[in-house]
């Protein structure tokens, strides 16, 4: 495909007018470019298949530009000629000699002279794409837009209504009341031209007719169309009569004597066209009977684009024998008339001229009646004259009848046209009916779809209603809950208000109590001050009392002096004791009178009664007779007599109104009791609440008694199992000294540390065993013997002398079957260590008491070299085992990795 093209000078003869005319048809403006759509539309007229045309396009446009220049178009024409001549479609075939290409009727001079502007659509490709977008946006139905949908688009142009109406009439080419995609593009093109101040044509010019709406000429391989019903036979039969009448009228002036045989006239159908029409006839004559019917040529005739009335007239002209079928010459004549109308616009004649009659149907000319009449004039026979007159009469009648026939034929022709128009109307109505049925089907489909949507909406509505009911119920329940919560909240608020009021009341009471306490504290301070003053007075009284006692002692000494007076001395020589001590006693008494002197009574002074020597100095008179607090007692009332938190209404009363001490004066003293020695029963300071009350029995300390694990028999060092011998006291291990003797496990224990203290009541019975006897478990299997060390001969432990293991009291000897054994019960489990020593020798002989049986022989390891050899072997063996374990571990890791990789691989 990329091979270099052969120069045009070698491909196409210079100045070929046929190629120039073809190029002018596809590029009338000589732009030098032929678009793909124009080239494809033109090349399809060659009758070649799409595959061959695609190959021709690839060879003509090797660079893939999407269009053809003049040289490429010439190459395409040359390749079309190669394909039509039977040559291979390649670039090497361009140099071959071949006939020019044929593009249906374009090879005819008539088609060659046709205006090239008619083969191109004036709507450009980019405009068509834009108009197609607008067309799709209007939502066409079955590819058509109604006037209601197109009207808003046209009205947006602001053009006059008469111009828009003319645009609609011009664009609706098939007059179906709808616009398809191409017709809509024509309408939009006219609107844009009108907006550019171009006049709207009254008739749609051929360049604006879409390619799909253009009337095609009949060409080889095409499939034209013919009317469904052939013209009536009456009209078809009447056609030759016109010719006969015309011929009669035209030849009536001829003299019968001068009737001359006309020379043969050439047929109007050219020979080249006759050959081409014969090819079409052979393709159309499927039954090969030499005739084609109206159904067989219907599509060929309709493909020309002519009206059905005109095609019916052409059929009537061609069917000269009125057989309803066309022979080969008649078919060629009909195709000639169609070609003349399509290419030149020449209407077919009303009657066939002599040159139009097929050559095979040309016969002897019709004999002229006038010649017969003239010949009868020269006969001279009367009968012949009568016959001539009769013939003339008949001719006149015939003429009148022919006139009637022509009138009736004209009426029939009119009726036929009316019928044809009605048939056309019927066809249009049928097509409209089909469209309406299609619309009805669409409407029914839409109705069904809407019914389905309606059913879905009903289901959705029912669901929504159900949801609404559920939500309504939920809302009602929530409202009920809200109401209940509101009532609860209201009650709680009431409770809160009551609690607040109660709190306020309590706070007020607390404030009052605090005030009362403060007042009580103030009174208490006053009382304390008074008490302090009273205490000071008491102290002064005590000091005076001490002075009195000293005076008493002094008086006593004076009495002793009296007693020591000798008998010979006269009593008068001694001074009076009262007079002697009066001044001193007065000073000591602080101004006491003689009547108040406690030492005035001599009987009492010299009495030997000890009780009478110490009378109460305050017996005669109460020193605290006057109570300083008697007027206003601060403790007159009990401040805690009423509950301040009770529900009773609080009264503003004095919290200290009641005197707790009103019944008895705390400072009152009787004449017989000392105020400072007698204690009040209710004195809160008489006893210390934290001192130990000797009257209460003291608690017994559970740990105050003897140690539960102590032994009453442990009173001497000799009974201590660890007192005589340290089991680890020996610093040398050369002998068995200091080790427990396990050979005495079966012997009954001596009086151990627990035997005396616990006796038979300590652990003689298992505290955790059941009351019933438990069946004894089967005896445990003895442990396997310890393997002998890998060394030479050694002396067993059982053969050691007694000097090696001296006998000593065993602090760990087994507690045998003694009743005092806390760990062994005849009815319970046996001692787990009372069995055979696993380290003892296998000999059944009872070892002597001095032997140290039960220990492994550690001297059997041999000398140092043997021990080193044994250690080496053991280390090598351990190393081999370690390496074997490593190898096994590596193998297991490898197998695990392989298994994991297989598991991760996709199936």
From Swiss-Prot:
Protein name per UniProt: Epidermal growth factor receptor substrate 15-like 1
Record PTM: Phosphorylated on tyrosine residues by EGFR.
Transmembrane residue ranges: none
A Pfam family recorded for this sequence: EH
Localisation: Cell membrane; Nucleus; Membrane, Coated pit
Keywords annotated in UniProt: Acetylation, Calcium, Cell membrane, Coated pit, Coiled coil, Endocytosis, Membrane, Metal-binding, Nucleus, Phosphoprotein, Repeat
Stretches the record annotates as Disordered: 229-260, 611-860
Protein task: Seems to be a constitutive component of clathrin-coated pits that is required for receptor-mediated endocytosis. Involved in endocytosis of integrin beta-1 (ITGB1) and transferrin receptor (TFR); internalization of ITGB1 as DAB2-dependent cargo but not TFR seems to require association with DAB2.
GO cellular component, one term: nucleus
N-acetylalanine PTM positions: 2
GO biological process: synaptic vesicle endocytosis
Gene Ontology molecular functions: calcium ion binding
Source organism phylogeny: Eukaryota, Metazoa, Chordata, Craniata, Vertebrata
Modified residues (Phosphotyrosine): 74, 562
Subunit structure: Interacts with EPS15, AGFG1/HRB and AGFG2/HRBL. Associates with the clathrin-associated adapter protein complex 2 (AP-2). Interacts with FCHO1. Interacts with FCHO2. Interacts (via EH domains) with DAB2. Interacts with UBQLN1 (via ubiquitin-like domain). Interacts with CAVIN3 (via leucine-zipper domain). Interacts with REPS2.
Domain called EF-hand: residue spans: 48-83, 159-194, 272-307, 308-341
Domain EH: 15-104, 127-215, 273-363
UniProt entry tagged with the keyword Coiled coil: yes
Sequence positions bearing Phosphoserine: 107-108, 229, 244, 253, 255, 259, 360, 369, 375, 558, 610, 664, 670, 695, 715, 732, 791
Binding site for Ca(2+): 172, 174, 176, 178, 183
InterPro entries: EF-hand-dom_pair (IPR011992), EF_Hand_1_Ca_BS (IPR018247), EF_hand_dom (IPR002048), EH_dom (IPR000261), UIM_dom (IPR003903)
Membrane topology: Peripheral membrane protein
Modified residues (Phosphothreonine): 364, 795
Primary location recorded for the protein, binned into one broad class: membrane
Pro residues biased stretches: 776-790
Gene3D superfamilies: 1.10.287.1490, EF-hand (1.10.238.10)
